[in-house]
Design a protein with these regions (language model features):
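Non-catalytic helical/linker scaffolds that mediate oligomerization, partner binding
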Residues: 1-235
Length: 235
């Protein structure tokens, strides 16, 4: 291996710092230098924690349940709550007819109505499956107004730069602005040499690919998430 990837979607700074220290020790023992790549968590949507002791909820095709966009509430079997990066309420951004895909598309929900009073979607279950807490959620063909750089990513990047990372993989890049904000942090901290790789994972990133390529040092085609956001045969 000549580069080690540190996935900041999981673990805290203590855990990541310990991993980096282990690799640095291995460098000394092997007499070889390797690259350190920080992979950001990025802006994302996940299912919320559950009320009570439930670990997951099971659903059958054709069932009708609700999805809540209000932030800071817990899920029940009848109302699945979403945790959105930046604490955004995405109710107004999602149209009737859109799919809500849970856990890499293992469960599909179709928005059939919107309740303005509760700011909840009424959804129909498209296949038998389960919903567990803190699982990833994708809403294809929907532009979510995430901040260019989430507070957590900002903190993680600054921590990684202090540890001497060489590369940053920026998750869910949608526009050149996403790359430029990370570049500004690198330059501000005297780390302008760090190379930035934009991860293309959704339709908006595809639409703005040319400007993203201009802004970044390289791109990664994250076919896993992209295969959920766009038709698989288009990846």
């Amino acid at each position: 291996a000549n580069t080690f990837r540190f996935n900041f979607s999981h673990g805290d700074h203590q855990e990541q710092g310990d991993r980096m220290a282990t690799v640095k020790l291995a460098e000394k023992l092997a007499g070889k230098k390797v690259g350190f790549l920080l992979d950001t968590k990025g802006p994302e949507i996940r299912t919320e924690l559950f009320e009570g002791d439930a670990k997951e909820y099971s659903y059958k095709t054709g069932e009708k349940i609700r999805v809540a966009t209000k932030q800071g509430i817990k899920s029940t079997r009848d109302v699945i709550a979403l945790n959105v990066a930046g604490a955004l309420d995405i109710y107004d951004d999602v149209e009737v007819g859109r799919q809500v895909l849970v856990d890499d598309g293992k469960l599909g929900l179709r928005v059939i109505a919107k309740d303005d009073a509760t700011r909840e979607f009424e959804v129909e279950v498209e296949n038998d499956g389960v919903v567990a807490k803190q699982k990833g959620v994708n809403i294809p063909n929907t532009k979510i107004p995430f901040p260019a750089l989430a507070e957590r990513d900002n903190d993680d990047i600054r921590f990684g730069l202090e540890q001497g990372i060489n590369f940053i993989a920026i998750s869910f890049v949608r526009t050149a602005k996403d790359v430029n904000e990370v570049r500004a942090i690198c330059e501000e901290t005297g780390n302008g040499h760090v190379q930035l790789f934009a991860k293309i994972e959704n339709q908006q990133g595809i639409d703005n690919l040319d400007e993203i390529i201009e802004a970044a040092d390289g791109i990664m085609i994250a076919r896993g998430d992209m295969g959920i956001e766009v038709p698989f045969e288009m990846v």
